[in-house]
């Protein structure tokens, strides 16, 4: 597969010498490769003996000469080698007519076809086989195909192309003039259009008159007509090369203009593509920034939710601590109430115990009095002692026991009332506690009085112990007086 590449297609032969062309391209011969001396020798005999490959049967006989004059050049670096370099390189061998690059540009290696003007330069080119061209050795061989050239244009097609090119040139000129001077440009276009139409009409009228004259002359003078025809043919022959030259020049100009326009279009398209790519990149960056902003907002919401959860947990912990503090206060208040109750109990001994103490102290006092009376009175008859030693009547004893039981009942009722009031006061608030303490002050005074009584009773007990020892001594003697018994009974009643 052969394909034309922009800037590397069919190249015409420049008129300058090969060495000056190489220097103008900036390609040094030393970098391209060493040229063998046999290739530069014009009198080559051995190279002409290289056999040419047989041609295919279906080859066009008109292209056989072109095939014999073309050479296949392979193992070219697709990134560095160009058709201009090959043209300048093979000009050293002979006159080069066409150079065509072939192969895929994306592949690392490519190949080319070089057509020489003379068949004698082909064996010289074959001598370059293996020569280093750049960084690779060349592979040169006879070609089996001719270079495909564009078809030659007919005069009608060339005229159409010229008209199209002229139209484009006129449009460009009008556009430029309108851009620079819109008003003056419009007036000039009008004048130019009138002058052109005037000249066209003149040319048409002159041609018509000339043809009429020729017809009249042909009728009368055939010889002069033949002479004029021959003259016209000569003029046409003389004018034809000028026309051809002008057409070729116009073609070249049109091609150069079309190329420049194509280049401008390509540059404009490239600029537009770059702008579009930049806009796309900007849009992508904006989308990325938006996504980042969304992620940041989500993270902020999550952080807020976490903070709310932490605050809720802290509130719960505070509530728990407050509940614990309340429970601790309640426990402390209960413990304080229990301690107070215990202190009260320890301070207030049971009245039964006090009454028993009093009864004991009264009995002791009786015994002491008896012992004293026995010691004072003289020892009389035994009959009197027996009468005094007799116990009192059972009726008196029953009355005393009933009084003692009533007093015990009253004391127990009072204690129960005090306990109930203390429990109610402990359940009330601190304000109630202060009131309870105020109410308990008289009770404490009573307890202090009871403690004083208990201290008095202890002193009396100590005295009773001393008296009991004396009474025990007196009982051995068996002395007692009735007057002392009466005093004892009155003390018990009290």
Swiss-Prot record:
GO cellular component: spliceosomal complex
SMART domains per record: RRM
Domain of life of the organism encoding this protein: Eukaryota
Region Disordered: start-end pairs: 176-494
Alphabetical keyword list: mRNA processing, mRNA splicing, Nucleus, Phosphoprotein, Spliceosome
Modified positions (Phosphothreonine) in chain numbering: 348
Modification type Phosphoserine: residues: 174, 187
InterPro entries, alphabetized: Nucleotide-bd_a/b_plait_sf (IPR012677), RBD_domain_sf (IPR035979), RRM_dom (IPR000504), SREK1_RRM2 (IPR034192)
Bias type Basic and acidic residues, positions: 183-192, 263-340, 404-453, 463-474
Bias (Basic residues) ranges: 193-230, 238-262, 357-373
Subcellular locations according to the entry: Nucleus
Tissue and organ expression note: Ubiquitous. Detected in liver, brain, lung, spleen, testis and pancreas.
Family per similarity comment: Belongs to the splicing factor SR family.
Role: Participates in the regulation of alternative splicing by modulating the activity of other splice facors. Inhibits the splicing activity of SFRS1, SFRS2 and SFRS6. Augments the splicing activity of SFRS3.
GO BP, one annotated term: mRNA processing
Protein's recorded name: Splicing regulatory glutamine/lysine-rich protein 1
GO terms for MF: RNA binding
Subunit structure of this chain's protein: Interacts with SREK1IP1. Homodimer. Binds SFRS1, SFRS2, SFRS3 and SFRS6. Interacts with the spliceosome.
Residue stretches making up the RRM domain: 69-145
This protein's record includes keyword Metal-binding: no
CDD domains xrefs: RRM2_SREK1
